[in-house]
Each structure stands twice: as structure tokens, then as C-alpha cells.
């Protein structure tokens, strides 16, 4: 609720500080990263015996990792803090936010909003932390710290590579080259609209939109016409 309540203010802060995106789209991203994420995960069991196959004598056991280091990008700063904090706490872990230097104000403010709300709801003090010394050396020290159990790295190729090379377990996310395929029977105007909407959302700052279009033979002229 705190994230949604402050969603517009934080979205405007992010655009003003970074110069990336549209604040209206970032409001939606903040809602996706907080309220909708929470509604999806709130009833999930994440710790203890998650499933049991008595026939095969296989049990799936969920165990918290410990301390998670979360690298936050400048393109999606506030929503990424919300999402990573929520999934970390839900799975029984503590989290340390590492802000991008180009978005430190809005990231730190989002951290403060979440920290206050989480502690009011009963989260242990210190379960959510944020790096205040924002330098490459500080980030490197965090990534390589022996007490860090997992790194969640969102950002450019160099940063994700640094996380993978740190010696600690890491999950990295960055820009990809995702093609979309339009088949002959597709509703071409609708397909093109969806692709353009995806690509232009938040002025194209999302890592996951379509980067290219592959069409089935014979419909490329129609697709090109719709794109004009």
C-alpha cells in the first residue's frame, strides 16, 4: 500500500533525476512491482516443505539464502527496488539495495518508504538496507562480500558481468535481443500495435520488449504498412 500510495511521487522523482522514461508509465510499473507482485506471491509457501512426492520419495524444501545484494538500474529504479525487496522478504531473506549513481535519490527515497512500511508491519529492523557510499569500489566490495548469499543484478552488460564474476551466486538481467514472430493467420494491426506499445512503453527503457520482427512469407508488406 505504501508503494502504491507513493507511486506517482516516486515515478516523477525517477524521471526528473534520470531523464529516462515517462512518469505515467513508471506509475504503472510501480504498481506492477508492488501491489500486483504481492497479490501474486502473498499466498505462496516459500520456506519449509514446499511439495512432497511420496511415490518417488522426493521432497522440495525451501530454505532462505541469507543476505541478498540487489543492484538497481537507472532505467527502472523505483519499481525494481519494490519488486526485489518484496520477493526477498517473502522468501525469508534480508536485502541490501545498491543504487545506480544516476538514480540514487529516487532509489534511496523508495527504500525509505518500503523500509518504514515493512518495519511497521513487523519486519525485523535491518532486514532492508541500502548502500550510502555509491562508488564502483563500494559496489565491488558488496558483490564480493563473503556474507552475501545471492546477487540480483539488473542493469547493463558490464554490471551483470561483474556480478557473475564476483565469486558469489548471481542472477543477472539486462537488455536482450528478443524477436517477435508474426504468423500468417495473425491479426496484423493488433500484432503491430502490441509490438509498438511494448517497444515504446516508458520510452523503451524496459529490458524485455521486442527488438526485431520476423514475419511469415507473404505478409511483410502488410506489416511494414501498419508500422508506418
Which residues does each predicted region cover?
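Short acidic loop-to-helix transition motifs that present clustered carboxylates
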Residues: 133-137, 157-159, 177
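Conserved small-residue-rich beta-alpha loop and adjacent elements
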Residues: 42-117, 121, 166-170, 177-178, ...
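N-terminal Rossmann-like NAD(P)+-binding subdomain of aldehyde/semialdehyde dehydrogenases
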Residues: 1-57
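ALDH superfamily catalytic-core signature
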Residues: 90, 160-228
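Glycine- and Gly-Pro-enriched alpha-helical subdomains that act as flexible
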Residues: 108-109, 120, 134, 138, ...
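A structured beta-alpha segment of the ubiquitous adenosine-cofactor-binding alpha/beta core
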Residues: 47-60, 129-148
Amino acid at each position: 500500500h505504501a508503494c502504491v500510495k507513493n507511486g506517482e511521487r516516486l515515478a516523477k522523482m525517477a524521471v526528473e533525476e534520470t531523464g529516462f522514461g515517462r512518469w505515467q508509465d513508471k506509475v504503472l510499473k510501480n504498481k506492477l512491482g508492488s501491489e500486483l507482485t504481492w497479490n501474486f506471491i502473498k499466498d505462496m509457501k516459500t520456506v519449509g516443505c514446499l511439495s512432497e512426492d511420496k511415490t518417488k520419495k522426493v521432497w522440495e524444501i525451501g530454505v532462505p539464502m541469507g543476505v541478498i545484494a540487489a543492484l538497481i538500474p537507472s532505467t527502472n529504479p523505483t519499481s525494481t527496488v519494490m519488486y526485489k525487496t518484496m520477493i526477498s522478504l517473502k522468501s525469508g531473506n534480508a536485502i541490501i539495495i545498491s543504487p545506480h549513481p544516476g538514480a540514487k535519490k529516487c532509489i534511496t527515497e523508495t527504500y525509505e518508504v518500503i523500509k518504514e512500511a515493512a518495519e511497521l508491519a513487523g519486519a525485523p529492523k535491518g532486514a532492508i538496507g541500502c548502500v550510502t557510499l555509491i562508488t564502483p569500489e563500494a559496489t565491488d566490495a558488496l558483490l564480493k562480500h563473503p556474507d552475501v548469499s545471492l546477487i540480483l543484478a539488473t542493469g547493463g552488460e558490464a554490471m551483470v558481468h561483474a556480478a557473475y564474476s564476483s565469486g558469489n551466486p548471481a542472477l543477472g538481467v539486462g537488455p536482450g535481443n528478443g524477436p517477435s514472430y508474426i504468423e500468417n493467420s495473425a491479426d496484423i494491426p493488433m500484432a503491430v500495435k502490441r509490438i509498438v506499445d511494448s517497444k515504446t512503453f516508458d520510452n523503451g527503457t524496459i529490458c524485455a520488449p521486442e527488438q526485431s520482427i520476423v514475419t511469415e512469407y507473404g505478409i511483410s508488406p502488410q506489416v511494414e504498412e501498419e508500422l508506418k
